[in-house]
Regions:
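Acidic/polar, glycine-enriched structural segments that form the non-catalytic walls/loops
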Residues: 3-9, 20-258, 275, 279
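Short helix/strand-bridging catalytic loops that position acidic/His residues to coordinate divalent metals
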Residues: 2-3, 266
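Carboxylate/His-rich catalytic cores and anion/metal-binding grooves
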Residues: 263-286
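Short, solvent-exposed loop/turn segments enriched in Ser/Thr/Gly
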Residues: 11-16
């Protein structure tokens, strides 16, 4: 969820994956949902050793994955991926939902043939790309008719330190200088799912309405497409003096950060919906 009027929510690195299924032929169908990822989310090179493990905590099952070395803020430049911090696949603990860590091919085969996951490994250490395990989630929705059934899981990333600013490592805004953990963030996301999704629907409609008034229906659709792209690849944090900073990061253009050629074209969105974010872009320039 990326609502610019809620800085905690904007900066929290927890995503919802929502799903809903319904029968189109008016018959009942037996349905199981399967989602997976791998530790590749948390590495820069396929040869990097990784450690993954299953965590069960406060009503949520997690599969956590990250590099063994954890070179925090150790890379810079273009064409690179984060290889510090931890990726998380998370789902509610329930009678019909499960997460599992296990063999990449075996996990899919188990689901395809039986509709279930392999019994989970508690921990998995890899040294090569071909050892990468599956981090899997399933929801046994049972018999599904025309009325449908729905659910959600969560995917998140704790980068530990978000940015080095004038030789000081800084945490992301949502951490509030270490007072909030990634598990706090997941638990809050789980508890607030329904209300946050409703807020997102209202916010989406506001963006569409405002843009249509300004430039017509096609313009509003373009703005809806651009909204997440404009906000993506930014880090929201505070400096040592408590100033709010909101920096963009170029992924494949010299590896620069907070460059004005990105700040200028993105400015209208932030000026319209949260000028504090625009100030966060400009503070370090002036």
């Amino acid at each position: 969820p990326l609502m610019m009027d809620d800085l905690d929510l904007l900066s929290t690195p927890v995503n919802y994956i929502s799903y809903r299924v319904r029968s189109l032929d008016k018959k009942q169908h037996d349905v199981q949902m399967y989602v997976e990822t791998t530790p590749q989310l948390a590495i820069n090179e396929l040869t990097q050793p990784t450690r993954s493990k299953v965590i069960r905590r406060n009503g949520i099952n997690y599969v956590q994955a990250g590099t063994i070395d954890q070179p925090i803020l150790g890379r810079k430049g273009d064409g690179i991926c984060i290889d510090w911090g931890y990726a998380y696949l998370a789902g509610n603990i329930g009678a019909n939902t499960a997460v599992s860590l296990g063999n990449y091919y075996g996990m899919k085969n188990e689901f395809a043939t039986k509709g279930t996951l392999l019994p989970t490994q508690a921990e998995c250490v890899t040294r090569r790309a071909d050892q990468m395990p599956a981090m899997a989630y399933t929801d046994n929705l049972g018999k599904v008719g025309a009325d449908g059934k729905s659910g959600f899981l969560m995917l998140g990333y704790d980068d530990i330190s978000a940015i080095e600013y004038f030789y000081q490592p800084r945490m992301a805004y949502w951490k509030h200088d270490g007072k909030v953990t990634i598990f706090d963030a997941f638990e809050r996301a789980k508890a607030n799912y329904a209300s946050v999704m409703e807020r997102c629907r209202v916010y989406d409609q506001m963006i569409l309405n405002d843009a249509e008034k300004a430039g017509g229906k096609e313009y509003s659709e373009l703005c809806a497409l651009a909204y997440r792209q404009v906000i993506a690849a930014h880090k929201l944090f505070k400096d040592a003096d408590g100033n709010l900073l909101f920096f963009s990061k170029e992924n494949n253009s010299n590896g620069c950060i907070n460059t004005v050629d990105l700040t200028y074209p993105s400015a209208p969105l932030f000026l319209a919906y949260n000028p504090e974010l625009q100030k966060g872009m400009m503070t370090s320039i002036f």
